[in-house]
Amino acid sequence: MSLTASAASAALTLLADGPDDGSKRPWRPNDPVKEQRDLYTQFVISTALGLSAFLAFCILRPKWTELYAARRRQRNAASRLPELPDTLFGWIPVLHQITEEEVLQSAGLDAYVFLSFFKFAIRFLLAVFIFAVAIILPMHYKYTGQYGVPGWDNPPGNKTTSPIDGSEKEKPVTDPAYLWIYVLFAYVFSGLAIYMLLDETKVIIRTRQTYLGNQTSTTDRTIRLSGIPHDLGTEDKIKEFVEGLRVGKVESITVCRKWRELDELIDERMKVIRELERAWTKHIGYKRPKNDGNALPLTEQQPRDADDERSGLLSGHDNEHVSGYSNERPKVRIWYGLFKLRFRMIDAIDYYEEKLRKIDEYIQNAREKEYRTTEIAFVTMESIAASQMLVQAILDPHPMQMFARLAPAPADVIWKNTYLSRTRRMVQSWSITFVIGFLTVFWSVLLVPIASLLELKTLETIVPRLAEFLQEHPIIKSLVQTGLPTLAFSLLTVAVPYLYEWLSNNQGMVSRGDVELSVISKNFFFSFFNLFLLFTVFGTASGFYGFWESLRDAFKDSTTIALALANSLEGLAPFYINLLILQGLGLFPFRLLEFGSVALYPFQFLSARTPREYAELSTPPKFSYGFSIPQTILILVICVVYSVFPSSWLICLFGLIYFTVGKFIYKYQLLYAMDHQQHSTGRAWPMICNRVFVGLLVHQLAMIGVLALRRAITRSLLLVPLLGFTVWFSYWFGRTYEPLMKFIALKSINRDQPGGGDISPSPSSTLSPPSGLDRDSLPIRIGGQDLELRLKKYVNPSLIVPLHAAWLPGRNPARGNGNGASAFEVHQTQNV
């Protein structure tokens, strides 16, 4: 279960466990025995789950290298990494010793930045944990008698009971002077977070500038021009305009055109060729070759037989029927007539071969057509310095014209969006942004009423026998009230990030890297607003109407948020402790097993029929920063918000475990197991920093609310300048540091190498085999198939992709009809 699902389920359980007396009083946990039992149960179960998953991975890793070492087997850049031993635990120190430089060279800047965030979080939480244990915990215990451990802290009364020896003692009298720790450590932790964040940012900027300044790829020398007026809509006029700025020479220009017809033909061809391959395979049969045990058990098949004979029989290009096979030639149903009400059965192989031949003719004719130009062009300069000067300058005195941006990698371009008009892209973008905002803000409106059905009082009305049984068995009651929300809402909350990803893909963005950054932003907003802020600020509402009243009051008066935060956070501490234990100890190790890929593999294997479909089974699982980064930021925000509360030491301890385990697991996945095709050159770091600033603001608001509730008005007002400083600093950070995370400084460019300064790199072909990791090495993806080649120039793949023949047993798909097949080699997974 993801963080989204587990957090939503647990939060709904908290709402369901609210007061049953119908009052609107705030809910407070008042059963120390239950809380202590839940904490121990959560810890034991999570530890058992995590250790089981980790041991299972250690056993299966050397056996299922096709899954757990998929990236290293198929990526040249990953092949430079050290070979991991096949022993049970021997791979752990080898992985730990891989340096940040090796991570950068193998997985790129995105992986380097992502793991740097874990390093920052570990450093920060370690410092907070030391302060919490050495100062904050003793202060809280001395003046309030609170340990910060669920079940140990006592309810209000004249005496307290020691959880260690059971002895009774007088309850400490609260001294208002101790409230200064909320003021002091709000400043200390905010300053510490900003200092460490700036320190890590400087390291990332220095690494990024050095790394990109020494690149000579086509991507680094290319800009994307948008808003091109009609009178400058040709290559020659654009070249004249750019070179007239006297910043450098133009190497090549690609003006985007309205290629919709051609793109649709290529997509249709891929569908037809797959149907043809299935028809042939159904007729002649195919079994995947047996491997040496490095794949999942379901891939253990008997070797093919008589492939050489079949290859000879299939080498002809006529439509003569091939006989001698046990299976009959398949048939396909063709509908015709008025309203397509009549049909007839015809030979499927003949039908799809004829359809493929006609589509190939249409494609050849479409490639020779002249298409209308759009307002977008990719301009490749002869030097990186020239391209950087263009993107960092205003090129035209007219607004919204000749606007230069950094270009994505050639294979990262979403070509179908390049021929959308600017108005169409803006309408799509703002419409989907409005839809996502509406869904995110009002998502909890759908969850809170359903949660009320899980209250014991409601169950007594609907299912009285079940309510009586649960009342008699508190452990089963706890499991049921936790499991039912999980069952009801986990699928819904897991589906939300995928819904946002689909919506982001329809916003009209030109590159997949921009889409992923958009997914990061949207998913964090959903997680932060719905699973933290709403359930914390309005978590005291009892029922649906109470929730609506709290929401209405918050919009009327902003101080309600600070007071509600302070009023709810301390009571929700057991929930967040359990959440951190579950995520860090229980669920994180399951990421190593790639349980989703393993669970889906049998269905994918059973549905595979053709050589192409079997080869696609071995492609590495895709890693998405859009799903991973928002969850980790939210965990850090929770730890920051609770950094001064009595339970700060416990929350920071399990947060520290979460980030330590997470860094290790993500390091393995990014380097060895999973593939990430979009490369945004580390541009996610400013987004991470801005969301950390949001966490600091929430922390400061909570401290203001805590002091205000304790009538320490003067001390709460002393935190207002810190609040203003954080807002100002986030603005200053964006103006000062973010440009260095987006552009390459001219001083950082290595002008002694080809393509760096005024020296033009040697001309290269349009396509060449990949060598190492750079932004030109992203594989071209046509019809869901990765091709083992890279584009060296900006050109729509539909214009140049070879029209291969069907990929049949015993015949290389590249030996097709000769339409440029020699320039390509289809990537086929090798079973080493």
Swiss-Prot record:
Compositional bias segments (type: Basic and acidic residues): 302-321
Membrane topology: Multi-pass membrane protein
BP GO annotations: amino acid transport
GO cellular component, one term: plasma membrane
UniProt keyword terms in alphabetical order: Amino-acid transport, Glycoprotein, Membrane, Transmembrane, Transmembrane helix, Transport, Vacuole
Chain residue ranges for the region called Disordered: 152-171, 291-322, 754-777
Top-level lineage group: Eukaryota
Subcellular location: Vacuole membrane
Pfam families per record: PHM7_cyt, RSN1_7TM, RSN1_TM
Parts of the chain that traverse the membrane: 39-59, 117-137, 178-198, 434-454, 483-503, 524-544, 560-582, 587-608, 623-645, 650-672, 687-707, 713-733
UniProt feature, compositional bias: Low complexity: 759-771
Main location: membrane
Any GO MF annotation of the entry: calcium-activated cation channel activity
UniProt key word Transmembrane helix: yes
Glycosylation site list: N158, N214
Consequence of gene disruption: Leads to a drastic reduction in the production of penicillin and its biosynthetic intermediates delta-(L-alpha-aminoadipyl-L-cysteinyl-D-valine) and isopenicillin N.
Function comment: Vacuolar transmembrane transporter that participates in the first stage of the beta-lactam biosynthesis (the formation of the ACV tripeptide), probably taking part in the supply of amino acids from the vacuolar lumen to the vacuole-anchored ACV synthetase.
Family: Belongs to the CSC1 (TC 1.A.17) family.
Identification of the protein by name: Vacuolar transmembrane transporter penV
Taxonomy of the source species: Eukaryota, Fungi, Dikarya, Ascomycota, Pezizomycotina
The gene coding this protein: penV
